[in-house]
């Protein structure tokens, strides 16, 4: 079975990165922490594309991915976080990726 990776990139309105990081730290992460077994990592840009929060998730298959998000969307605390976070986003991009047959795979 080939793992599925979900790469989510949130490009924020200029000047909103610190507010977004505070929201994720205090409201987003507490709701998402129970699902960290799927999380490869969260990242912010330092050079190049700025004002971005990028996160990468790994799932056994698409059914696992859909089940996790369905469970997260049922968490009241996450939905309250999302309502505050969405206005900070200028562009949201989600990609589903398959691991290549060579090289290491996180």
Predicted features and spans:
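Basic/polar N-terminal segments that are highly enriched at the extreme N-terminus
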Residues: 1-2, 106
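Active-site-flanking beta-strand signature of metal-NTP-handling nucleotidyl enzymes
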Residues: 5-10, 54
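Short glycine-enriched loop/turn motifs at secondary-structure junctions
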Residues: 4, 48-51
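Short, flexible segments with low predicted structural confidence
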Residues: 3-5, 37-38
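Short, solvent-exposed polar/charged micro-motifs at secondary-structure junctions
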Residues: 51-53, 104-106
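Short, solvent-exposed loop/turn elements at beta->coil junctions and helix N-caps
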Residues: 43-45
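An amphipathic, aromatic/His-enriched active-site/gating alpha helix that lines ligand/cofactor pockets
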Residues: 18-40, 49, 58-96, 102
């Amino acid at each position: 079975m080939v793992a599925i990776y979900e790469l989510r990139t949130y490009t924020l309105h200029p000047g909103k990165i610190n507010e977004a990081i505070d929201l994720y730290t205090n409201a987003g992460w507490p709701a998402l922490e129970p699902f960290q077994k799927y999380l490869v990592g969260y990242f912010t840009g330092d050079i190049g594309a700025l004002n971005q929060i990028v996160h990468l998730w790994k799932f056994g298959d698409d059914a696992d991915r859909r089940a996790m998000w369905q469970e997260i969307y049922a968490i009241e605390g996450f939905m309250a976080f999302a309502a505050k976070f969405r206005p900070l986003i200028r562009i949201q991009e989600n990609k589903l990726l398959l691991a290549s047959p060579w090289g290491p795979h996180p």
